Swiss-Prot record:
Organism: Salmonella paratyphi A (strain AKU_12601)
Family membership: Belongs to the metallo-dependent hydrolases superfamily. Uronate isomerase family.
PANTHER family referenced in this protein's UniProt entry, alphabetically: URONATE ISOMERASE
Keyword Isomerase: yes
Catalytic activity from the UniProt record: D-glucuronate = D-fructuronate; aldehydo-D-galacturonate = keto-D-tagaturonate
Alphabetically ordered keywords of this record: Isomerase
Protein's UniProt name: Uronate isomerase
UniProt cross-references to NCBIfam families, sorted A to Z: PRK02925.1
Root EC class: isomerase
Amino acid sequence: MATFMTEDFLLKNDIARTLYHKYAAPMPIYDFHCHLSPQEIADDRRFDNLGQIWLEGDHYKWRALRSAGVDESLITGKETSDYEKYMAWANTVPKTLGNPLYHWTHLELRRPFGITSTLFGPDTAESIWTQCNEKLATPAFSARGIMQQMNVRMVGTTDDPIDSLEYHRQIAADDSINIEVAPSWRPDKVFKIELDGFVDYLGKLEAAADVSITRFDDLRQALTRRLDHFAACGCRASDHGIETLRFAPVPDDAQLDAILGKRLAGETLSELEIAQFTTAVLVWLGRQYAARGWVMQLHIGAIRNNNTRMFRLLGPDTGFDSIGDNNISWALSRLLDSMDVTNELPKTILYCLNPRDNEVLATMIGNFQGPGIAGKVQFGSGWWFNDQKDGMLRQLEQLSQMGLLSQFVGMLTDSRSFLSYTRHEYFRRILCNLLGQWAQDGEIPDDEAMLSRMVQDICFNNAQRYFTIK
């Protein structure tokens, strides 16, 4: 019987173990998409205790706590202490067997805290609390200290076009920081004209860009100024959260002006008008990314804020989102083609939340590859509800069957937590075990030189090359 979480965790044969320990584990981390706070990195935040760094803002854990029947006051309550929330988590973890949270929890205790032989639960919580808090009080366990311990080379944060990026500039000017922290352009509030806050947001964009927006070309000018600002601060990637993938042929500027004018006047737009405006903005933005050498990321298929009562109480991104089931293939094909037809499709990474769409994306990327760019269009790693063992395996296997796994840019945390870098370890173990199993079964050559290059490329090298502006 295997022992839980040894050094060979998830590695089932000698080939897998060699690939992981010798080649994957030493590679740096290139975390090109996350939701870390740039201010916390700039300020080198020190965490008061394990409960704070572990549970603050972690909606994965919050969902598990709710499923275990824990009172909301012990999850997000403002008046509840970090220790009380931590103990609620300690009582919940033994109930998460079979959920990736059980693996992640113990991986996060192993690295960076060095707790390797103790199962986390109510009986061990007090001892672990004390051990971890002692370490969190040292400089090696500040925000940047943890990143350095985990061998992080680069992180890409997620930033709104109106953001000042002052903390990115502060980080770039600090010679003591040897980790690149690059902003990523997230313009969701610009192209989602149907949202209630769209008009108010345009007012903020006007102020940030110093451009009055009454026509579509005004919007282009405002966005161009903000794109220039992001570029000056080291941005080379964009990201778009797309719940409903719409497409309509882009109308002329007169029609776009009319659509924008109706919305600014408070009138209700038709579904066609929403699709026309959304498509126009996304296609125009895509062409700007291509001209700048940026990567375009599309995260497709979440259904957000399902629980109205809790949304009113806590707001977005608090654990009440799930997988949508809208059809995406036709609209995605037309959207990408609208940029490619003029040879202005940027490097693109596609992520789907519904695993039903894995093969859709795995085959879609082959339609739009470009000469001179290996893996120009990528099928991104298992996202959100899919960044667990089965989800990662599905994505890896389907990409390998329908594309080129060797060109894959690999894993990202997509996380708000400084302890989530162990997800790269989790991914790397799964990747090495998959390749090791194929080699053991005679499906691919047991060629250490060939396989080690592939592992190192997927773990780091491909992403570093892909996100470099040439």
